[in-house]
A protein has these predicted regions:
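Generic beta-sheet signal
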Residues: 32-34, 173
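Short gly/pro/ser/thr-enriched loop/turn and capping motifs at secondary-structure boundaries
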Residues: 37-40, 178-181, 257-259
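PAPS-dependent sulfotransferase catalytic domain
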Residues: 7, 100-254, 264-279
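A conserved segment at the C-terminal end of the G1
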Residues: 17-29
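P-loop (Walker A) phosphate-binding loop of NTP-binding proteins
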Residues: 10-11
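PAPS-dependent sulfotransferases, especially Golgi type II membrane carbohydrate sulfotransferases
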Residues: 1-6, 248-397
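Phosphate/oxyanion-binding loops and surfaces in catalytic or ligand/nucleic-acid-binding neighborhoods
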Residues: 26-32, 46-49, 57, 187, ...
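PAPS-dependent sulfation machinery
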Residues: 34-149
Length: 397
């Protein structure tokens, strides 16, 4: 049987290793966790250059940063360009630089394969993706039916991948951002702490695009959305659904922790959690550790930023929007300023606190957004805006 490709999207601290390693316990599946974000950074840069040239935007600064696409008409237009693209784009950057960055990054997530990253090659991005998957295949002792990887921040590239690989399928893993942001803000290495606003916007982007993909011409029936919480609380049911989606027989090894193997450390998977609770199973206690420990002002700030998306996912909110906008307005603005003025290694905002605060509050206070370009600026797409207006939920498992 011909091997097909599988691609996943999630955000950091969302259980990407857990679900990819669990699925890889099934001999029909092999997935790697976050093997090469540089592949997407270089792809984003090249798409930006093409977009700049087509739109004749001389002053547009192109870079490798993974965008959230909120708050700017140009960013919204760039997202539409990426959503209409494919991987048949020539690789024009310095291949040695790309290999070196890929190698350095791989030592953090797939160090068992990192030496192979020094030789990754391809004339187009499609060929680079294929070569990346060939490297991942080296982990498998047989010919799996499904082969691929999951990466963070990159959900906007799913349509391009779908056009280039017509038989590929896609997984989207969602986790409550209050849990992931709490975990990120409390990591030991302070250099890994992200800006809360930027992380929240990437979560919003993930939800808006995931919902639209369920109706997409290129992705309909090729995409499966599940939550980290469902994986932890109902592992057998959740993994069975994924196996059904992939048309492979469920293997109970995927839900037996003793069989979940950490490929890069060459040992049984132990997980990584700021709770410091030892991991020996699909642990419910660790999942909600954040609820007893998160700072109340940070909780309000996150719920303010992700209010509509949390509701759309069915997550229970501790605060209602009206209270956040009135009684807690001052505290939220203080959290905003503290977050935006703090030095971090990664952020995707404009760097202008007043502009960002004004934008986020107007996103909530505008009674109705009518212009398509404004809907995209505030909510990414019309599909999610309709969900917000009608108080509906997206389909997750």
């Amino acid at each position: 049987m011909k091997t097909k490709y599988i691609f996943g999207a999630s955000l950091p601290r969302s259980g990407t290793k857990l679900y990819t390693y669990a699925l890889s316990a099934n001999k029909k599946i092999m997935m790697a966790s976050n093997p090469n974000i540089e592949l997407f950074k270089f792809l984003k840069k090249e798409n930006s250059e093409i977009f700049k040239k087509r739109k004749k935007l001389k002053n547009l600064k192109t870079n490798y940063m993974m965008e959230d696409y909120y708050g700017s008409y140009k960013k919204s237009d760039m997202l539409q360009h990426i959503l209409r693209s494919n991987l048949n784009i020539k690789f024009k950057e310095n291949i040695k630089e790309f290999r070196n960055k890929s190698y350095i990054r791989s030592k953090r997530e797939i160090k068992d394969l990192s030496l192979h990253m020094k030789k990754i090659s391809g004339k187009t991005f499609k060929e680079l993706f294929e070569d990346q998957i060939k490297i991942i295949k080296k982990r498998s002792k047989n010919d799996p039916q499904w082969l691929g990887f999951s990466e963070s921040w990159v959900i906007e590239f799913f349509p391009a991948i779908a056009r280039s690989f017509p038989d590929a399928k896609f997984l989207i893993n969602i986790r409550d951002p209050r849990a992931t942001i709490y975990a990120n803000q409390n990591v030991r290495k302070k250099s890994k702490i992200a800006q809360i606003l930027s992380y929240s916007r990437h979560f919003r982007k993930q939800i808006a695009l995931a919902n639209s993909y369920l109706k997409s011409k290129h992705l309909k029936n090729r995409i499966h959305i599940f939550t980290y919480e469902s994986l932890v609380f109902y592992p057998k049911k959740t993994i069975k659904r994924i196996c059904k989606f992939l048309d492979v027989r469920f293997d109970s090894k995927s839900t037996q922790y003793k069989n979940i193997y950490d490929f890069q450390n060459k040992e049984n998977f132990k997980g990584a959690s700021i709770s410091l609770i030892p991991l020996s199973n699909f642990d419910k206690k660790r999942t909600y550790f954040w609820k007893q420990n998160i700072n109340d002002n940070i909780l309000k700030y996150i719920e303010f930023l992700c209010y509509h998306e949390l509701k759309a996912c069915g997550y229970k909110l501790f605060n209602n929007l009206e209270t956040l906008l009135t009684k807690n307005k001052k505290k939220i603005k203080e959290s905003f300023k503290k977050d935006l003025l703090r030095k971090v290694n990664w952020r995707s905002d404009s760097g202008n606190p007043k502009k960002e605060i004004r934008f986020e509050f107007s996103r909530h206070t505008k009674k109705k957004v009518t212009k398509t370009k404004d809907i995209k600026k505030y909510f990414i797409n019309d599909d999610f805006y309709k969900i917000k207006l009608k108080n509906k939920k997206i389909n997750t498992f």
